[in-house]
Amino acid sequence: MDDDEQKGYTWEAGYAEGLNINDVLVEDEGGSIEKSIAKYVADSKRKARLTKRPERIRLGIMRHVMIVIDCSRFMTSKAMPPSRFVVVMKALQTFLDRFFEQNPIAQIGLITCKDRKADRLTMMTGNIRVLKESLNTLTEAFCGGDFSLQNALQLACANLKGMPGHVSREVVLVISALSTIDPGNIYSTIETMKRMNIRCSAIGLSAEMFVCKEMAKATKGEYSVALDPDHLQLLFSKHTLPPSSAKSSECNAIHVGFPHHELITTRSFCVCHPDTKPISSRGFICTQCGARHCSIPAECPVCKLTLVAAPQLARAFRHLQPLSAFEQIEVTRGFCYACETRLSGEGFRCGSCQLVFCLDCDTLLHESLHVCPGCN
């Protein structure tokens, strides 16, 4: 009888094998799985760094991303101390820094969902300061009610449908609820997102939801459930790299303007804040129609010209020729080529120049610099 109780039911084995629970989450002597989660996160980071990124593919580097934040009553849960809301806000702040470092010509908009309704918190912008200030206005007391996936997707679709065909349109949902209360058929909304080539991804904070899994599968997005705050940061980091562009997307030449950041002395209003005064005395003047903008990259609403800075385009170019993954090798003696630290145990060798680097330098080169000092 004791052996049967330990084995459990037959149908449980299928789920355990599919999720590799027995291999990933192993309890320690005290019955905790924190060490197993930390090891899983570290192994995932190592695997991502050692995986060679595909080359010679079309990438959607002009990204327009709507981030949907679940602000239902489930966000106040203490499952991730101090609360899921605090953990998500901190992770989003870090994600914004990394996102715009990797995607300098991208834009992000914010949507909150509570009381079965979705509201736009921030319109599409490339100004990270505006996005962070908007996040700081949210408090845990703001959370309440239930989550509605359909209303969130419909509002995101309304904000993305007017974007030009050559941009990558994406939705990233952060969901804490275990259910969604929708006014209609959610699968018809998912079909609409698929038809409009809007890539929908989700990060769960509770357990896996079948409808989110089907949404990600239909729209070629990603869906994962966070195990702890560190794992949540890892899941967010997966969305910093630009996705591959669909074959059906437009690939025409784009007319681009390069305005200068200058002090504006004449009295004027900006097209991004038509109802209020400009947020700064400095701004960007559209090179085609002369409209004032507070920040770039942006698409001028007057003449539809794409406005960017030359350094932003240069930084976006690195995704077209990414730094190849280094080969992990066993090292008994020698020094790291970059920081000259003595190597012992493992090293990472560049496939082009055959020079060996330590773990810290390998991480720095692939996540920040994107160039090999030995090859250059």
Curated annotation (Swiss-Prot):
PROSITE patterns: VWFA, ZF_ZZ_1
Subcellular localization: Nucleus
S-S bonds: none
The protein's name: General transcription factor IIH subunit 2
MF GO annotations: zinc ion binding
The protein's assembly and partners: Component of the 7-subunit TFIIH core complex composed of xpb-1, xpd-1, gtf-2H1, gtf-2H2C, gtf-2H3, Y73F8A.24 and gtf-2H5, which is active in NER. The core complex associates with the 3-subunit CDK-activating kinase (CAK) module composed of cyh-1, cdk-7 and mnat-1 to form the 10-subunit holoenzyme (holo-TFIIH) active in transcription.
Stored InterPro entries: C1-like_sf, Ssl1-like, TFIIH_C1-like_dom, TFIIH_SSL1/p44, VWF_A, vWFA_dom_sf, Znf_C2H2_type, Znf_RING/FYVE/PHD
Domain VWFA residue range list: 64-206
GO CC field: transcription factor TFIIH core complex; transcription factor TFIIH holo complex
Matching Gene3D superfamilies: von Willebrand factor, type A domain (3.40.50.410), Zinc/RING finger domain, C3HC4 (zinc finger) (3.30.40.10)
Organism in which the protein naturally occurs: Caenorhabditis elegans
Entry's family note: Belongs to the GTF2H2 family.
Protein's GO biological process: DNA-templated transcription; nucleotide-excision repair; regulation of transcription by RNA polymerase II
Keywords annotated in UniProt: DNA damage, DNA repair, Metal-binding, Nucleus, Transcription, Transcription regulation, Zinc, Zinc-finger
Domain of life: Eukaryota
Biological role: Component of the general transcription and DNA repair factor IIH (TFIIH) core complex, which is involved in general and transcription-coupled nucleotide excision repair (NER) of damaged DNA and, when complexed to CAK, in RNA transcription by RNA polymerase II. In NER, TFIIH acts by opening DNA around the lesion to allow the excision of the damaged oligonucleotide and its replacement by a new DNA fragment. In transcription, TFIIH has an essential role in transcription initiation.
